[in-house]
């Protein structure tokens, strides 16, 4: 019986585990894994193809080749299972044990593991406190190392050459011991007392002051503590036994023609065994030391190559001069085990084919070719055939299917019914790249796809292919149906907009049908209902665009909500509309008013329409509505018959004159340049400006001419109406093309760029209708070619960014409903340059309020803290003019391993509060990565056209209200009575009658204020003006000018104006000054009062000093009298170097990698008063004195622009030296909220420029992951080391434990890690190793004996479990709860049994309660 049961033992449930630990294996551990020692380098006998005994494929060690058959054939078949054959020594068992049984090689001499030696920082070096070079010299037998100095003056671990060694031996005899090779290193490692070392290091860390030492000790301490904690002995880094991989994992495959294909590992193992055997023999023969040493070195090298080929010295090569693939190469990189096999598996039950359009499908359907369906659903069909009794065996069923008998097709129809399939289009950039559909069987070989889902898949029908996958199990089908069905995914997860928006033909049809024309056929008629309109239209009595009056029945929501009352009631009203709109009103879902259709439907409008439908009528009605819109759009587009011809491209009549005028202006500039009035650069900039303006003007003229057409109205008068020109309609509706493209067809092509990004100053004045000449065509080719090259580069870069983002966020999942925090971030409307870039409603929609939202007028609470702000809420808030709302964000969430639903808010792809289990991290990464390919790659050179457009010279109010200045605004009144601004960061606000901020404008230094604080103004009033071309240097005090260090030819040069003959002094660039002395001085002005004394800053002993920057034109003379507010010098903005602005993808990557910009601006470290100390060579010294009187110094390069002045009070984190901000400084000085605002706004700027909408919360989620580690400042009583970086949740858990035990918790600083760094420093070594730098990650983890708790998604995919997100999260929770209850039940039963029957150590107890 037992033997019978043994048969069923085969199918074991794989073991359930919750964590994976990695460590170093001790020699004994390796021997315990092994099934025998591999003694010979032979593989198989090439005549018999049987493995050699004791060789690399030995059947005795690794198991039989055929199932249940020993090698010599004495025992065959199942009945001998488990017998060990006495002839060949092979155990009779399954052949697949050859995949899991390991062997070993006993090394004749120990060998260092190359990973722990060469993977930087060298772990061996850290433990031994020796340099890598020294250890290498010892290991590779170039030097001796002292192991035990005995009574000699030598030091332990001292390195000596062979010569030294022999001299010392002569001197001291065998007083001391020195060794070579791995034996020596092993001895040293064994002699280390880790506990003792850790103690001394900790005390030294406390006592030392030097930065470098602290760093060095902390590193070493970390490694030693890791050994101490993990219980791994350091000498295990030296191998005495080498494990041998099971043979099936390094197969030897016979090719035809008697040759073999072999895995490189076999070669590497053969070398090790050969050298090892040779060394054994040499040792037995007592060969000379030098020969043995050489052999040992070769063995070390052979093992190095096996473990990580090419890590040290030249890589071992095979017969074909190709480096052999070692164990390390097997797991790392794109083709390694992690990314190729564990994260990138192939899928069974799948097919792929070309897609074609399926306009007759419903949104949730796809057309599946019959042949493909037959193949995909084969197993189901077999089953049905057997159940129905058509076929008795699988073989018969197979035959039926192959012959494609009629019964098979009937069964296929039945099997496929309500069995969804998943369609995927590569590249899958976001979750809408895979959606489920119900298959509809079709003839032909192409898959039919519904047109509305194309936007989500980013698919078109120019030959795209898609893959089909079949969910097999019932659970999989259910999830596909409820979560992935196309009709359940109608919103983009990136921004919550509808994804099923019509495009192209559909838009054109709807637009054409909803346009109105003057004096169309049947204008002015009235109809009693829509059916009458349709009849009139079908009888050609009216045209689609004619204006008519129609009685329209709308279904409106019933006010009466009592039981049994209908949800919608009809309401009839008369509308002035057009025939087309009236006909379309038929398909409106109940609950939407006709007014949403009563306008020309352009693409944006249709999107808004579908969005409104979704919010008001729910998912189901929206899907039906979208489908009907599509059907109508296609039908109407066909009826419209819109086509284009050359005559539709109307070239504007004014083009000739506009271009002629421009050419004249350019000639004039050339003349000025020839006579030396303007520089070459200025001429070029001006020419480029003229042509870009001309191009605009021609384009504008063209659009004006194209967009309207003359028409005779009903009264017989001529009037103009919006044009029915085909090209104009296509662009206007958003169906195809844009104003820019039309400009190229009918305006002028304009300026072209060279491949390096600079603009060619000769424009293409022709357009495509007129045709290009050869030169113009040639210039055009530049752009086209660069476009293609850019696209390829962009795709790769964008993919890499997405990969890094996914990796850093993959373990962020919503794990609870509410973390209960009251923290949040104050959200305001985003205003730039006085314009609202993003309204408050868009920023808070779908968020949870962190504190009560209060009506500013009545002070009543509108929405309590914890309320989800939906569309109605944000409309209320906007209507009441509330301009700041505190909302919960992912950054302030206090959930430890994950996020809570309240802090995240609405799930944008579903339109309701996010569910527990949603993998919000991955969604965020996809939302940011997916539009990456739309971003530009280039860095913009600001200069010429681009900067000209951006120069403003005044600022005016856009709304009525009161002017308010911010605290940092300072100004002086000059002799003319004008107010001149002298603050660098002043801003003017405009507030409305209740004091709410409506606009905010930056007022630059040197501007003249036209309105003062508190002034009531009307919209359009100018607030301030300034000179856009120069930046002034202004004095705040009056007096007599006294120059210092202003020497002609040294620090300044005289420039004489060619035209006017006037001379000015210009400050020379530091780098161009001749003498060393001149480089360190700074030209400046002091002021003298009437008595000739220096004017002091009021309230201080400091004299007023006003420095001149490089390039400043000094406008005052030495000894001149100046008044307050007078200009001393001007800096032409042209002479400021054109800063390259990194835009597009590189900018996004730069922000997420948290790179510090070069020439970053400097922020004030403390709050205090500014003063200037003694200048050093080339640097000026800025001192901030804080409130306690401590001084903080900054050294600033002289050419930098200082934004503060003597005596100014600055706040901590305020910018004091101009330059791009450094995110690390923002975090350190202004905190997490300011950092998050900075990163979110900067990333959004890049995407907004390309017109891409991404919700802020996705960026916040990534910032949260970048902040997930903290740096320990004071370790208290915790197990951390000061300066160590640890996971935030780990730190908080540890601190909670300390507080519970009444010990001192640790203090810490927040640190910002770039996404790559953050991915690599994650606590999960499996996830980090599969991302980048596999060797380093695994080495580190092995030494620390790290344990991976499998919290993230990636680790679980790799080990092949359900991921802890979505339904998987619930599954794991339930499984853990069951294990817990099982354990408790087991304990309880055990306790009861002990109580009743007694245990060996104690007799049973008497029942305490008396029997009842």
UniProtKB/Swiss-Prot annotation:
One of its GO terms (cellular component) is DNA-directed RNA polymerase complex. Zn(2+) 2 binds at residues 819, 893, 900, 903. Its cofactor is Mg(2+); Zn(2+). One of its GO terms (biological process) is DNA-templated transcription. SMART domains: RPOLA_N. Binds 1 Mg(2+) ion per subunit. Zn(2+) 1 binds at residues 70, 72, 85, 88. The keyword Transferase applies. GO terms for molecular function: DNA binding; DNA-directed RNA polymerase activity; magnesium ion binding; zinc ion binding. It holds the Pfam family RNA_pol_Rpb1_3. The keyword Transcription applies. Residues 1393-1412 are annotated as: Disordered. Keywords: DNA-directed RNA polymerase, Magnesium, Metal-binding, Nucleotidyltransferase, Transcription, Transferase, Zinc. Its EC number is 2.7.7.6. Mg(2+) binds at residues 460, 462, 464. It catalyses: RNA(n) + a ribonucleoside 5'-triphosphate = RNA(n+1) + diphosphate. The RNAP catalytic core consists of 2 alpha, 1 beta, 1 beta' and 1 omega subunit. When a sigma factor is associated with the core the holoenzyme is formed, which can initiate transcription. DNA-dependent RNA polymerase catalyzes the transcription of DNA into RNA using the four ribonucleoside triphosphates as substrates. HAMAP family: RNApol_bact_RpoC. Belongs to the RNA polymerase beta' chain family. This is DNA-directed RNA polymerase subunit beta'. It comes from Burkholderia mallei (strain ATCC 23344). The gene is rpoC.
């Amino acid at each position: 019986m037992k033997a019978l049961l043994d048969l069923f033992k085969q199918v074991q449930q794989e073991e359930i585990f919750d964590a994976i630990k990695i460590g170093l294996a001790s020699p004994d551990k390796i021997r315990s894994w092994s099934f025998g020692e591999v003694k010979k380098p032979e593989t198989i006998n090439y005549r018999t193809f049987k493995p050699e005994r004791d060789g690399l494929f030995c059947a005795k060690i690794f198991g039989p080749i055929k199932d249940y058959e020993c090698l010599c054939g004495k025992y065959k078949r199942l009945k001998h299972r488990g017998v060990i054959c006495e002839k060949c020594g092979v155990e009779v068992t399954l052949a697949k044990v050859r995949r899991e049984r390991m062997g070993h090689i006993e090394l004749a001499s120990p060998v260092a593991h190359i990973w722990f030696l060469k993977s930087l920082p060298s772990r061996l070096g850290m433990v031994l406190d020796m340099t890598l070079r020294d250890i290498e010299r010892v290991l590779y037998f170039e030097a001796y190392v002292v192991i035990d100095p005995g009574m000699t003056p030598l030091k332990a671990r001292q390195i000596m050459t062979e010569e030294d060694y022999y001299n010392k031996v002569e001197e001291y005899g065998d007083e001391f011991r020195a060794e070579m090779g791995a034996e020596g290193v092993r001895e040293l490692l064994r002699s280390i007392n880790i506990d003792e070392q850790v103690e001394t290091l900790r005390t030294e860390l406390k006592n030392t002051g030097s930065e470098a030492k602290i760093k060095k000790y902390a590193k070493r301490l970390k490694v030693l503590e890791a050994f101490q904690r993990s219980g791994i002995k350091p000498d295990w880094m030296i191998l005495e036994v080498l494990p041998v991989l099971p043979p099936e994992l390094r197969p030897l495959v016979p090719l035809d023609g008697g040759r073999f294909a072999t895995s490189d590992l076999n070669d590497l193992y053969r070398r090790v065994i050969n050298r090892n055997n040779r060394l054994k023999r040499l040792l037995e023969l007592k060969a000379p030391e030098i020969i043995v040493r050489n052999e040992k070195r070769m063995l070390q090298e052979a093992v190095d190559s096996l473990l990580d080929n090419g890590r040290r010295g030249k890589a071992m090569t095979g017969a074909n001069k190709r480096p052999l693939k070692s164990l390390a190469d097997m797991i790392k990189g794109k083709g390694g085990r992690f990314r190729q096999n564990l994260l990138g598996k192939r899928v069974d039950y799948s097919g792929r084919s070309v897609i074609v359009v399926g306009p007759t499908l419903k949104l949730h359907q796809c057309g599946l070719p019959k042949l493909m369906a037959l193949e995909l659903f084969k197993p189901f069909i077999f089953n049905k055939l057997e159940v129905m009794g058509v076929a008795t065996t699988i073989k018969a069923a197979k035959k039926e299917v192959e012959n494609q008998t009629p019964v098979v097709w009937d069964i296929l129809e039945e099997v496929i019914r309500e069995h969804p399939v998943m369609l995927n289009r590569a590249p899958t950039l976001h979750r809408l790249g895979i959606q489920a559909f119900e298959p509809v069987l079709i003839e032909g070989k192409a898959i039919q796809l519904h047109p509305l889902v194309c936007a989500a898949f980013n698919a078109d029908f120019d030959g795209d292919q898609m893959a089909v996958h079949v969910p097999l199990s019932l659970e999989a089908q259910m999830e596909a149906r409820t979560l992935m069905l196309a009709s359940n995914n109608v919103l983009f997860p990136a921004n919550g907009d509808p994804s099923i928006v019509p495009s192209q033909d559909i838009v054109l049809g709807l637009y054409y049908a909803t346009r109105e024309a003057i004096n169309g056929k049947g204008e002015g008629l009235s109809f009693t209902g829509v059916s009458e309109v349709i009849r009139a239209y079908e009888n050609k009595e009216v045209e689609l665009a004619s204006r008519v009056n129609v009685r329209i029945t709308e279904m409106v929501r019933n006010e009466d909500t009592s039981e049994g009352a209908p949800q919608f009631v009809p309401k009839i009203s008369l509308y002035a509309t057009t025939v087309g709109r009236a006909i379309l009103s038929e398909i409106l879902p109940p609950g939407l008013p006709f007014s949403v259709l009563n306008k020309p439907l352009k693409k944006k409008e249709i999107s808004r329409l579908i969005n409104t439908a979704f919010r008001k009528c729910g998912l189901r009605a929206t899907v039906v509505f979208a489908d009907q819109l599509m059907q109508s759009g296609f039908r109407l587009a066909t009826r419209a018959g819109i086509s284009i011809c050359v005559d539709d491209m109307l070239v504007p009549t004014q083009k000739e004159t506009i271009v002629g005028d421009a050419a004249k202006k350019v000639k004039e500039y050339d003349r000025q340049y020839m006579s030396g009035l303007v520089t070459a650069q200025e001429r070029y900039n001006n020419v480029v400006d003229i042509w870009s303006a001309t191009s605009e003007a021609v384009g504008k003229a063209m659009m004006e001419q194209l967009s309207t057409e003359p028409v005779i109205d009903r009264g017989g008068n001529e009037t103009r109406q919006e044009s029915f020109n085909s090209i104009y309609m296509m662009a206007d509706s958003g169906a195809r093309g844009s104003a820019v493209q039309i400009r190229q067809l009918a305006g002028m092509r304009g300026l072209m760029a060279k491949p390096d990004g600079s603009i060619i100053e000769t424009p293409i004045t022709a357009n495509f209708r007129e045709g290009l000449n050869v030169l113009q065509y040639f210039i055009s080719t530049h752009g086209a070619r660069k476009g293609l090259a850019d696209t390829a580069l962009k795709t790769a870069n964008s993919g890499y960014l997405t990969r890094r983002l996914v990796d850093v966020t993959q373990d962020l999942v919503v794990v609870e409903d509410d973390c209960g925090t009251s923290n949040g971030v104050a959200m305001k409307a985003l205003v730039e340059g006085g314009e609202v870039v993003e309204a408050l409603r868009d920023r808070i929609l779908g968020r949870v309020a962190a504190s009560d939202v209060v009506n500013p007028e009545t002070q009543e609470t509108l929405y309590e803290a914890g309320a989800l702000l939906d569309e109605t809420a944000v409309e209320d808030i906007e209507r009441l003019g509330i301009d700041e709302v505190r909302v919960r964000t992912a950054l302030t969430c206090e959930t430890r391993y994950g996020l809570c639903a309240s802090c995240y808010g609405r799930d944008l792809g579903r339109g309701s509060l996010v569910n527990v289990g949603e993998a919000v991290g991955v969604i965020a990464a996809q939302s940011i990565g997916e539009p990456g390919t739309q971003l530009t790659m280039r860095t913009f050179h600001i200069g010429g056209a681009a900067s000209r457009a951006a120069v403003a010279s005044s600022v005016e109010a856009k709304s009525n209200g009161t002017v308010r200045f911010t605290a940092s605004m300072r100004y002086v009144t000059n002799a003319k009575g004008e107010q001149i601004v002298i603050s660098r960061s002043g801003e003017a606000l405009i507030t409305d009658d209740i004091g709410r901020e409506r606009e905010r404008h930056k007022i630059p230094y040197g501007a003249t204020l036209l309105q003062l604080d508190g002034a009531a103004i009307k919209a359009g009033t100018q607030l301030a003006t300034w000179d856009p071309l120069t930046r002034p240097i202004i004095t705040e005090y009056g007096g007599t000018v006294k120059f210092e260090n202003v020497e002609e030819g040294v620090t300044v040069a005289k420039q004489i104006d060619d035209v006017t003959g006037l001379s000015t002094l210009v400050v020379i660039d530091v780098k161009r000054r001749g003498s060393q002395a001149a480089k360190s001085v700074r030209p400046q002005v002091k002021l003298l009062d009437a008595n000739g004394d220096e004017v002091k800053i009021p309230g201080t002993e400091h004299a007023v000093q006003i420095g001149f920057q490089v390039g400043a034109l000094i406008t005052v003379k030495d000894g001149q009298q100046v008044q307050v507010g007078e200009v001393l010098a001007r800096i032409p903005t042209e002479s400021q170097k054109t800063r390259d602005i990194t835009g597009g993808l590189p900018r996004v990557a730069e922000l997420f990698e948290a790179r510090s910009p070069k020439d970053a601006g400097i922020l004030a470290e403390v709050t205090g008063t500014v003063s200037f100390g003694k200048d050093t060579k080339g640097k000026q010294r800025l001192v901030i004195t804080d409130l306690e009187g401590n001084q903080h110094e900054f050294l600033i390069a002289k050419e930098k622009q200082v934004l503060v002045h003597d005596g100014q009070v600055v706040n901590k984190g305020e910018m004091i030296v101009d330059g791009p901000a450094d995110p690390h400084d923002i975090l350190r000085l202004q905190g997490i909220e300011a950092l998050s605002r900075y990163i979110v706004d900067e990333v959004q700027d890049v995407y907004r420029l390309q017109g891409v909408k991404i919700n802020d919360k996705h960026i916040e989620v990534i910032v949260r992951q970048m902040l997930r580690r903290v740096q320990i400042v004071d370790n208290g009583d915790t197990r951390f080391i000061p300066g160590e970086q640890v996971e935030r949740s780990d730190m908080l858990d540890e601190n909670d434990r300390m507080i519970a035990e009444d010990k001192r918790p640790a203090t810490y600083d927040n640190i910002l890690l770039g996404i790559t760094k953050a991915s690599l420093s994650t606590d999960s070594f499996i996830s980090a190793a599969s991302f980048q730098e596999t060797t380093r990650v695994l080495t580190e983890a092995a030494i620390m004996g790290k344990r991976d708790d499998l919290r993230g998604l990636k680790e679980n995919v790799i080990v092949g479990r359900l991921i802890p997100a979505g339904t998987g999260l619930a599954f794991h929770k339930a499984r853990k709860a069951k294990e817990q209850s099982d354990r408790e039940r087991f304990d309880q039963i055990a306790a009861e049994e002990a109580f009743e029957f007694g245990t060996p150590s104690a007799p049973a107890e008497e029942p305490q309660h008396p029997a009842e």
